[in-house]
Amino acid sequence: MSTLKEKLITQIASERTIPNSKVTVVGVGQVGMACAISILGKRLGDELALVDVWEDKLKGEMMDLQHGSLFLQTHKIVADKDYAVTANSKIVVVTAGVRQQEGESRLNLVQRNVNVFKFIIPQIIKYSPDCTILVVSNPVDILTYVTWKLSGLPKHRVIGSGCNLDSARFRYLMSEKLGIHPSSCHGWILGEHGDSSVAVWSGVNVAGVSLQELNPAMGTDRDSEKWKEVHKQVVESAYEVIKLKGYTNWAIGLSVADLLETMMKNLCRVHPVSTMVKGMYGIENEVFLSLPCVLSASGLTSVINQKLKDDEVAQLRSSADTLWSIQKDLKDL
C-alpha cells in the first residue's frame, strides 16, 4: 500500500547526498551560535552542522534553528557530538574552548584551550580532509598555530579570525569620531588579536585622504585630538563588553560570517586575518599574526605587502615576540 508521500510525489532521480557548500561550527556556546545565525542569515551554505560535547544544549540549539527553517535558505541543519556529522564540510569554524573570564587576557587562556584542540582538530580532519579551518577560539593567533600543527594542513587552509573584528571596531570608532559611515572609514589593525595589536596609523584614510597627513601627530602622545585613544578603546572593548554582559558574541559572529562570505563566494576580498608570518617584516619565528590577506574559495591565497613605518614594523615584531614567548613552551604539537 502506497504511503501519502508516495502518492504525492513521483521521484524522477535520486537526490544528491554530498553537500556543495557545507559549513560546520564546532562549539555551540554564545560565540558559536552567533556565528551560526550570522552564517544562516547570509545564506552561505546548503548545510550547517553543529558539534559539541554538551548534548542537551546541542540538540536544543539544533531544534531551535530547525524550527525557523521556513525563514532560512539553508534547508539542512544537523547536530551531533559525533564528528561524523561534520563530514564533507567546505569550511569548519572552531569556536570551542574555555570561556575568557572578566579581566583575563587572551594569552592566559592558551594552555587551557590547547588540550581541547588536541581532540577537536584530528576529528575535523578525519571527516573533512579537504576543508579550510577558520579558528575563532581565543587566544586565536596561538590556537591557529596549534591547529596548523595538529591538522597537517597547508598554511593557506588554516586561518585565524584574527584582527578582522579589531579592524571593524577601529573603523566603527573612527566613524563615530568623524560622522562618516564605517564602510567609508579605512584603517587596519594588525598583529595579535588583542593586547599587543598594531594600529597602522600611516594607512588610515577617508576617500584616499591620509588622516595622518592632515594630523601628523595622529596616533602619538603629542596628538591633541587623542586619536591614540581610539586604538586603546579597540583593545579594551572586548573586556568592557565582557564586564557588562559576561561575554562577547554578536560582533564576532558577524565578523566570521563576513570572512565565510568572502571564501564561499570566492570574492578575493582583503581581510586582516591571522596567518603564518615567518619571513615577513623580519619575523623569524613560526607565529600567526594578522596581516591584510586575500581570501578566496581556496582559503588564504596571498598577503598584501603593506608599507609600514619603522615604528609600526617594530610593534608588529614585538607582537610576534609576545606570542612566541608563550608558544615556544607548548608541548605535544
From Swiss-Prot:
It is an enzyme of class 1 (oxidoreductase). GO terms for molecular function: L-lactate dehydrogenase activity. GO terms for cellular component: cytoplasm. Its EC number is 1.1.1.27. Substrate binds at R106, N138, R169, T248. One of its GO terms (biological process) is lactate metabolic process. The keyword Oxidoreductase applies. The keyword Oxidoreductase applies. It catalyses: (S)-lactate + NAD(+) = pyruvate + NADH + H(+). It comes from the Eukaryota. This is L-lactate dehydrogenase B chain. It comes from Alligator mississippiensis (American alligator).
